[in-house]
A protein has these predicted regions:
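Short, solvent-exposed loop/turn segments enriched in Ser/Thr/Gly
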Residues: 123-129, 195
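Extended low-complexity, serine/threonine- and proline-enriched intrinsically disordered segments
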Residues: 51-60, 145-160
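Short beta-strand elements
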Residues: 98-106, 206-219
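Substrate-binding clefts and catalytic carboxylate motifs of secreted carbohydrate-active enzymes
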Residues: 1-124, 136-137
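Short aromatic-acidic-glycine turn motif
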Residues: 65-67, 109-112, 150-167, 219
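Short glycine/proline/serine/threonine-rich loop/turn segments at secondary-structure transition edges
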Residues: 192-198
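Short, hydrophobic beta-strand segments
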Residues: 75-81, 171-192
Length: 219
């Protein structure tokens, strides 16, 4: 970690103060989940333009902090991990914004989603399909990885797959890959033939429901 605990105040502080001002084009890894070993000391960062933010764990306040107190403009708390709900409540000009993270279970399924439910059958239009590992309650699982495969039927051109990791070296021209933060991306291109492209995903005992993308001739 780039942080250590200030024993006098119990707050996280940088191991090398001011290093963030000198580091170019790099950033430390961050996780968008609340799943860690019990009592693991975790640095919680909150990115916000609110004047102050209160952090709560399972309804208990862990203190309110002010943006002006953080030179790098990132709120920070040192929190021993306890399963449950982590909530940040920000206040700005009397208005409140809230963001929560919950402890999730083991992956039990795959959820597929896309913004492009219909695309033109012009041989150029593209559809992006995101596969996300989810637990039994449908919560995104972002702390575990699985290898998943996409199954497709219809007229399409496979442009590739990716998981968003900057160090990903898996085969782009494939219908399977290992997730990163529980996610993977499938990119398809239409042909000039109208079609219904039916997509599902499976892997390591997990499966998804089917989704359909319609390619159509434009009028």
């Amino acid at each position: 970690s780039i942080y250590k605990i200030d024993e006098a105040r119990g707050n996280p502080v940088e191991r090398n103060p001011g290093a963030w001002e000198k580091a170019l084009w790099v950033w430390h890894d961050v996780n968008e989940h609340w799943n860690y070993p019990d009592d693991c000391m975790t640095i919680v960062e909150v990115y916000s333009n609110c004047e102050e933010v209160e952090l709560l764990l399972n309804g208990q306040s862990l203190g309110t902090k002010h943006l002006a107190d953080f030179e790098d403009r990132i709120y920070k708390w040192a929190v021993p991990f306890t399963a449950g709900t982590l909530e940040a409540r920000g206040t700005k000009a009397g208005k409140q914004a809230t963001l929560k993270r919950i402890t999730v279970g083991e992956p039990t399924g795959i959820q597929l989603s896309t913004y492009e439910e219909t695309v033109a059958a012009d041989g150029k239009s593209v559809a992006h399909i995101v596969a996300q590992l989810v637990d039994e309650n449908g919560n995104p699982v972002k702390n575990q990885e699985r290898e998943i495969s996409f199954n497709l039927r219809g007229d399409y051109r496979l442009l590739g797959v990716d998981n968003g990791a900057p160090d990903n070296v898996q085969d782009l021209q494939s219908n399977s890959l290992i997730t990163d933060q529980g996610r993977s991306l499938l990119i398809l291109q239409s042909t000039e033939e109208p079609s219904s492209i039916i997509i599902s995903a499976q892997g390591e005992g997990l499966s998804s429901e089917e989704i359909t993308i319609i390619t159509h001739q434009e009028l």
